[in-house]
């Protein structure tokens, strides 16, 4: 059954063109209702019972969900056309945007993989005794509480355990915290008078499901506000402590933890042969969820909060974001741009935002100017992982400009870096970050923007993030004859080799994690493939001659897909057998430095061995007169002829 869109003009407050919306997004539209959530609720019920219905209302979702539950049918879908398009100073011209938003609502929602987290309610409270003991008394009814007291206070209740110690490390998240303590002591329950304590010992280990930090000191984990199961409160603020007790009591049971990112270890360029190369994700992760693990990195899914910054800055696409996947995000941008043009729009703009931005848009629509008719909002759960590949892809899909609306809690490190990279490829006037906290100010900025011309022939970039960025960059720079210069730390580029210093030892080839550096098995030659280079810097770091320099740039020509010779020389011919080996200039340089000067090569015969291949060198070594491994000559084999020759009568 085809999906039907129920339209409502919200008491006549917005203009709706059902014919244009329906034809552009290829969906049946109802007549335009006026009070679908109140007086015309029976009409809504009749349509919901038909199934496959989307209601153009974001404000009254709960009303229609309750109605569907009462009718014992599946809840309808929802799309907000009013706040994002209809309530606007340009609402009369917003039909193309409404069609685009309606078409986006038809797309299937991707399912994020997840894992179950189990919390049995084992709780550790850390803090001074007067506050920690009172909180433990309340929580002991529902949780298994242990108090790590930080002062000399002693409990008057045995409803919970009490220990002393100094936390050396705390790792993990909800349902799986592990900690190590020094100066650890346990309470001795027996005896009269004050409680006694066990002897002090170090390196004690323990585990718990929930950690309540009442110390008021530096947090024990990175990004404490995003570490699930780790709760903090100011011990001097009774209200925050009470709130902490309520939150902790809810953290018992089975929870669903999304697996935000996927790691492909074989693609990771973190290190090779114990030489560290790429550390982008390690440097930018705000939660400390990423740790080195040999030649690759590991991501702890229990600690990861899903900001997506690691995926945005990963040069090899070893880390990919799954909430949503890049393919699903590209599908949304594609359908928005295509439907907008199909409905008669010309130069759409894209505003990427999160839940905070959605609330600003609603406030601007209700009390201010709303959004311009050519500005299409795209809501994401997190925006910090919206990288240069996604920005370029949006422009390649046909958007004239792309802006990311920041929120007060948005991590900006990756966004700033990715924006600079995208602007170097597409130009500064087509991309930007908006840091506005006032809805009216946001509207003023959006209405005053200069809108550049969009791509005349939009393309559909596919593949991984590197492939998407390259295809989009080619579409945006069709006349680029020279490589585009990029900012430092860009994931694309070339290497410059000082041929005078390079000895063609090829150590860089053996360690290059992406295979951008290639040798030639037939002759001394160093080849390079531009599009495979990650600019990880491993070749530069391990080059014994310091002959390599990184050149961040993006070569959009076809030559970037083939091998280019960076350095080559003639091989040396063995003076004994003529076999080719080594590098001619290197062998000659060694002869110049060692022949006649080094004790091992003092004579001409010994110096000549430098000019031999490996087989001839071994033979010459064993045939020389002063060979230290040489023994007496083998005795000649005695034959019958010898016996005959010794007879006197013969």
Where are these regions (language model features)?
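Flexible gly/pro/ser-rich segments immediately N-terminal to CXXCH heme-c attachment motifs
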Residues: 296-306, 497-502, 525-535, 563-564, ...
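Terminal amphipathic helices with adjacent charged low-complexity linkers/tails
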Residues: 293-333, 403, 410-413, 417-420, ...
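Short acidic loop-to-helix transition motifs that present clustered carboxylates
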Residues: 35-41, 297, 383-387, 526
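Ferredoxin-type iron-sulfur electron-transfer modules and their immediate structural context
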Residues: 1-144, 148-284, 288, 347-361, ...
């Amino acid at each position: 059954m085809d999906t039907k869109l129920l339209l409502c003009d919200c008491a006549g407050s917005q203009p709706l063109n059902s014919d244009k919306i329906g034809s552009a997004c290829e969906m049946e539209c109802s007549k335009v209702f006026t009070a679908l959530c109140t007086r015309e609720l029976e009409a809504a019920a009749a349509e919901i019972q038909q199934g496959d219905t989307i209601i153009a209302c974001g404000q009254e979702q709960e009303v229609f969900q309750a109605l569907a539950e009462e009718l014992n049918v599946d809840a309808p879908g929802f799309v907000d056309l009013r706040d994002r398009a209809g309530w606007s100073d340009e609402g009369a011209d917003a039909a193309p945007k409404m069609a685009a938003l309606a078409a986006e609502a038809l797309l299937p929602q991707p399912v994020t993989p997840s894992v179950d987290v189990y919390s049995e309610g084992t709780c550790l409270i850390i803090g001074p005794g007067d506050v920690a003991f009172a909180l433990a008394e309340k929580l002991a009814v529902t949780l298994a509480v242990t108090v790590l007291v930080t002062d000399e206070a002693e409990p008057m209740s045995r409803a919970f355990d009490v220990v002393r110690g100094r936390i050396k490390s705390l790792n993990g998240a909800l349902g799986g915290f592990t900690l190590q303590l020094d100066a650890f002591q346990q309470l001795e329950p027996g005896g009269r008078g004050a409680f006694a304590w066990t002897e002090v010992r170090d390196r004690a280990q323990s585990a718990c499901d929930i950690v309540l930090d009442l110390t008021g000191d530096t947090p024990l984990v990175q990004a404490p506000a995003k570490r699930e199961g780790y709760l903090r409160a100011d011990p001097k603020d009774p209200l925050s402590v009470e709130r902490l007790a309520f939150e902790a009591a809810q953290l018992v049971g089975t929870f669903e933890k999304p697996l935000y990112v996927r790691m492909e270890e074989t693609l990771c360029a973190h290190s090779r042969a114990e030489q560290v190369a790429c550390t982008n994700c390690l440097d930018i992760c705000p939660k400390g969820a990423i740790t080195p693990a040999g030649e690759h990195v590991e991501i702890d899914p229990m600690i990861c909060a899903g900001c997506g910054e690691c995926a945005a800055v990963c040069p090899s696409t070893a880390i990919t974001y799954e909430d949503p996947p890049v393919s699903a995000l590209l599908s949304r941008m594609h359908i928005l741009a295509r439907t907008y043009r199909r409905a008669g729009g010309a130069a759409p703009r894209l505003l990427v935002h999160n839940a905070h931005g959605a609330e600003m848009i609603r406030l601007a629509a209700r009390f201010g100017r709303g959004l311009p008719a050519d500005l299409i909002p795209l809501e994401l759960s997190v925006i910090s992982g919206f990288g240069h590949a996604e920005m370029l892809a949006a422009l390649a899909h046909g958007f004239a400009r792309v802006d990311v609306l920041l929120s007060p809690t948005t991590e900006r490190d990756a966004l700033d870096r990715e924006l600079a990279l995208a602007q170097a490829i597409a130009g500064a006037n087509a991309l930007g970050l908006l840091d506005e906290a006032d809805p009216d100010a946001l509207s003023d900025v959006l209405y005053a923007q200069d809108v550049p011309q969009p791509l005349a022939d939009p393309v559909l970039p596919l593949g991984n993030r590197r492939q998407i960025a390259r295809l989009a960059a080619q579409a945006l720079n069709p006349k680029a004859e020279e490589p585009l210069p990029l900012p430092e730390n860009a994931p694309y580029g070339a290497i410059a080799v000082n041929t005078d210093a390079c000895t063609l030892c090829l150590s860089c080839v053996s360690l290059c994690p992406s295979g951008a550096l290639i040798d030639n098995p037939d002759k001394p030659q160093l080849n390079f493939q531009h599009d495979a280079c990650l600019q990880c810097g491993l070749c530069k770091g391990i080059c014994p001659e310091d002959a390599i320099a990184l050149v961040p740039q993006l070569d959009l020509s076809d030559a970037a897909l083939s091998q280019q010779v960076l350095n080559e020389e003639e091989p040396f011919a063995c003076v004994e057998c003529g076999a080719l080996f080594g590098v001619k200039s290197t062998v000659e340089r060694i002869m110049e430095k060692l022949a006649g000067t080094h004790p091992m090569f003092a004579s001409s015969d010994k110096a000549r061995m430098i000019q031999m291949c490996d087989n001839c060198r071994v033979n010459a070594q064993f045939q020389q007169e002063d060979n230290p491994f040489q023994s007496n000559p083998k005795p000649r084999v005695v034959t019958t002829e010898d016996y005959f020759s010794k007879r006197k009568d013969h």
